[in-house]
């Protein structure tokens, strides 16, 4: 992806690896080839096709140029964040005795279910994929216990857990602006925020379902959507036809502006049922904004008591919003920040480097 949680995680991990004295090289798919030195290390882009219907996702589909690049780079560690098109890299690394780690950024059966594959068939397909991955890679890194379950199910012994993190300096409660909140709320009493890719597996329609349910119950609520994707046209059309007060901002590339939005909102919605961590929800918590998250995902494990886990319906998400709004505002915002402070990037980088059995970074502390 060109944006979103995975891109954020790769950038933050790269900066952490660099600060710990390593020489990280990130290889990503893109439209054209490039090779840049950045604050997260060296970033090499290889041309990769766009997956139809995903609204911009690209993959490293051509093995020959990537294999040649890996041979030229001669890495002493390999970390892979694509469990589909790059599965072959585990065997490549084994043959060369290079310790390789695969990071499970999503559950295979969870993604298959969101695409409509029946539960048992999804589990069987996921088990086949995961057995091969567990054999091919020295370690499998899962960011939550929830993500780890599908590997526990097959008896994998090389699974370690390493949570992701959040930028506690950029994402902070002090960014909350009553002026911005009033402008985005457009006269409503409650401002909801959805920061998500607008694609099938993220279930963004649940946010509109919740908004409609809350308004039917007499609450003056509006919704801001920060994100883009293939479902955007249908969501915009629905909001217009049902006269729902929704602002579609599209992709917000300015991370500072996004943090301002996350701090201004009263509640953040995270309806994706296959999320293995949910960085945008964690960023909202760091800004002091509580979260209603899908009970089917890993997010209840991340948000804890600072949020509400809801079944995957608009009515249940609306109930979760009401539950959070019933808590005193100072208490719910303080609880959100306190929860986020358990997930700083320094701890994340330390855990990932430990999975690689590599040199660890020096201590750091996040700001408020």
Which residue stretches match the model-derived regions?
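Donor nucleotide-sugar binding/catalytic pocket of nucleotide-sugar-dependent glycosyltransferases
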Residues: 28, 44-47, 123, 127-176
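A charged, aromatic-enriched C-terminal amphipathic alpha-helix characteristic of glycosyltransferases
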Residues: 178, 330-357
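Conserved donor-binding/catalytic core segment of Leloir-type glycosyltransferases
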Residues: 180, 185-212
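Nucleotide-activated donor-binding/catalytic signature segment of Leloir-type glycosyltransferases, i.e.
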Residues: 233-252
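Short alpha-helical donor nucleotide-sugar binding micro-motif in glycosyltransferases
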Residues: 251, 259-265
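Aromatic "clamp/platform" in nucleotide-sugar-dependent glycosyltransferases that forms part
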Residues: 273
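Short hydrophobic beta-strand element within catalytic cores of glycosyltransferases
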Residues: 290-293
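Conserved acidic donor-binding segment of nucleotide-sugar-dependent glycosyltransferases
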Residues: 305-315, 323-329
